[in-house]
Amino acid sequence: MKKHFFFIFMFLLMTRICAFAYPNMIVEHYTAERGLPNNIVNCTLKGQDGFVWFGTWYGLCSFDGTKFRSYDNHDGFYSADIPPRKIQRIVEDRNGYLWIKTIDRKLYLFDKKHESFHAVYDDVKEYSENIQIIKIQTTDDGDVLLLTKDKSLLRANTDQNGKITMKQLHDSRPNVNVYD
């Protein structure tokens, strides 16, 4: 009986000691009142630059650890026809450019140095009849894979100046042979 009591006592003592070994976690909630452009955050990315990037219902937002910065087009500053809103996914390529997929399946490139958006429509349309982007994913070497609605698969990358290069990995369009 004394053995059982001793083991139970030691077990309870050890669990109590282990509970104190964990550091206190501080959880902060960020809302529109604290700087987010919208309370709906669809995706996040920790960039190579250390910033945390948020894709929100109202557009792109960065956080440097102390303050938020929204990249909207209220002042007409950004070069894209319509800056991305309703962002669904953000990935970063090897050169630090952000590839942004929106809920309406459009694709944008964000240049962090110049704080400019580029609609990637013209770069994709020669490879796919349906330019709606279903999924974006980075590869181990920093390229970006793009899956279109018609199931074409593209591999994209940027150079140091932001010029986009695309290569088609899979063409879903059927081969059409024309005979006289």
Can you name each region flagged by the protein language model?
Residues 1-180:
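Carboxylate-rich, polar loop motifs that coordinate divalent cations or form catalytic acidic clusters
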